[in-house]
Amino acid sequence: MRRKRDSYDYVIIGGGSAGSVLGARLSEDKDKNVLVLEAGRSDYFWDLFIQMPAALMFPSGNRFYDWEYQTDEEPHMGRRVDHARGKVLGGSSSINGMIYQRGNPMDYEGWAEPEGMDTWDFAHCLPYFKKLETTYGAAPYDKVRGHDGPIKLKRGPATNPLFKSFFNAGVEAGYHKTADVNGYRQEGFGPFDSQVHHGRRMSASRAYLRPALRRRNLDVETRAFVTKLIFDENNSKKVTGVTFKKNGKEHTVHANEVILSGGAFNTPQLLQLSGIGDSEFLKSKGIEPRMHLPGVGENFEDHLEVYIQHKCKQPVSLQPSLDVKRMPFIGLQWIFARKGAAASNHFEGGGFVRSNDDVDYPNLMFHFLPIAVRYDGQKAPVAHGYQVHVGPMYSNSRGSLKIKSKDPFEKPSIVFNYLSTKEDEREWVEAIRVARNILKQKAMDPFNGGEISPGPQVQTDEEILDWVRKDGETALHPSCSAKMGPASDPMAVVDPLTMKVHGMENLRVVDASAMPRTTNGNIHAPVLMLAEKAADIIRGRKPLEPQYVDYYKHGIDDEKAGAMEDDPFYQY
């Protein structure tokens, strides 16, 4: 994978989730030459750490796969928080948990509230979600889900008896099962969609970029670290190309348009290095400002999560699969048949609920696992166990990203300000109490051998918050650090109608940094949707027709509307 020329119509910086979509879609126009520059390595088909779903814990913290970011000391947690980001073609879609969640329709209604953002409401986003999906778990008559897109989605199957008991425990706690968390009703408990197809990870690179590589007008260059943007000598706001380093050598490539798709960390960093950001801050780092956009690196959002772990009384969990002696058999089963414990991401089910009556739609997300193990591979000291991941979904805490110097290889200063507001603290206490209430229901009695973490000694609000401060981890959903918004918004960076950086020429942003607000759930699906929609904008194509559909609204619809029991197709 190498570039064949020195000038392109489009140069895409970043071959991650958004960059893979753009590379595939923009190269559909045969008269346009497209180059994707990826700083990481290729996602080789033989690389088990990428391709094997259950190996998802191994790339994180490994310098060959992960940029290994860290926040500064978080002021309200008293420690730094590790952030894994994909250093490989496919970006974080090549190392993430493979969970596919659109978010709640009301997330996008919130996106559309500001002036000029009306084309980002749910009706305008839904056709692009459908365009990217092939949803094998959806009913063939389901008009809300996609059935022939490049991202192949497996439903559940959540057949381990612990899943059924967890879903039933949710019902006993006063909630409902839902037919599809990505369909009419997000609120409730049920199987999740995962980006696993025929036992292999379905990354954005696998789905979009690799099938397009046969095109002569698409080039992909890996291990190409972009160090700066090139500007017109006579127009300081017109981008004409990029400079990148590969194998110690500097290269320059020219472009009619440059599209930043480096993600929520890399995109604002490169903008600031290029003189686009808060003018006074840039001057303090010895950088001449080109465009005063104080929102670059601000409005930073993320989801924080914790694991509540339990000992399992019956030998039905997947804990034995963590035994080193069993791993060769599990690995061989996957290599030769793409089956067995290694063929699943094991995030096969969970749920979304409202923690209080003041919120209009779910503010808590649960991932259930029939195993007790941390994301870094540290397992609980029990023969059998299970856990639930939980955290608030739309915290009002906001952080920032700022470069430390003019050196593009120096990692930026990152602070998310987790737990910085009273509302954030309140929702965290509610999250733990709601999760514990579900896990203590009768449906879990046959398996409940007692809480391992945080443990029965953690009970008061302050004890809960202390535990979250000590044990909380990022859910790896950074976003909104170069947000879309109208020019009238002083903190907006990207024009929502063109995806161009305000005040700049030939420069666009298409990735998670452009999200105006984070969504309720894992953010990979919204990033794919955003990139699909942006591709039509960039190509000057007529956008897909908006699709106005009903979706579940608490307090307006019958509380059982869209629940599993309403549709015989969905029974579990």
Curated annotation (Swiss-Prot):
Write the record's keywords in alphabetical order, separated by commas.
Answer: FAD, Flavoprotein, NAD, Oxidoreductase
**Group of enzyme by EC:** oxidoreductase
Catalytic machinery residues = 477 (proton acceptor)
Q: Which Pfam families match?
A: GMC_oxred_C, GMC_oxred_N
Q: Name one GO molecular function term.
A: choline dehydrogenase activity
* Superkingdom to which the source organism belongs: Bacteria
Pathway-wise, it operates in:
Amine and polyamine biosynthesis; betaine biosynthesis via choline pathway; betaine aldehyde from choline (cytochrome c reductase route): step 1/1
Q: What is its EC number?
A: 1.1.99.1, 1.2.1.8
Q: Name the PANTHER family for this protein.
A: CHOLINE DEHYDROGENASE, MITOCHONDRIAL, GLUCOSE-METHANOL-CHOLINE GMC OXIDOREDUCTASE
Q: Which family does it belong to?
A: Belongs to the GMC oxidoreductase family.
Write the protein's name: Oxygen-dependent choline dehydrogenase
